[in-house]
Amino acid sequence: MRAFLRNQKYEDMHNIIHILQIRKLRHRLSNFPRLPGILAPETVLLPFCYKVFRKKEKVKRSQKATEFIDYSIEQSHHAILTPLQTHLTMKGSSMKCSSLSSEAILFTLTLQLTQTLGLECCLLYLSKTIHPQII
């Protein structure tokens, strides 16, 4: 069972890193305050990443191009808090065996999100703090 959970965590972490690499984000260029609190596990963050980053295909003449579009381009980062809170509340209620409470995760993510410039920055910051030795 432990091996399965360890493999699942690695797979989730790999997916987050892949999303961030697709967006061509560079973690060395970002400078964020180190906030105290409980960091969200990657299994909580991953589904929200997929809601935020969507794949849109555009057809230009005879050429087909794939672009990654950010849902939040026209919104302030504060507007992102509502869907994030909804997602974490639903995810937290399904995490019966977790030692982290959804309220603690939500509080920490809210702090991190409101102190960064945008959602991409928030996701990047969280990925750095979840697995700093890998990224």
Curated annotation (Swiss-Prot):
Predominant localisation class: cytoplasm
Domain of life: Eukaryota
Protein's name in the database: Prostate and breast cancer overexpressed gene 1 protein
Tissue specificity comment: Expressed in colon, prostate, small intestine, testis and spleen, with lower expression in thymus, ovary, and peripheral blood leukocytes. Up-regulated expression in prostate, breast, and bladder cancer, but not in lung and colon cancer.
GO CC aspect terms: centriolar satellite; cytosol; nucleoplasm
Keywords, sorted A to Z: Cytoplasm, Nucleus
Record organism: Homo sapiens (Human)
Cell compartment(s), UniProt: Cytoplasm; Nucleus
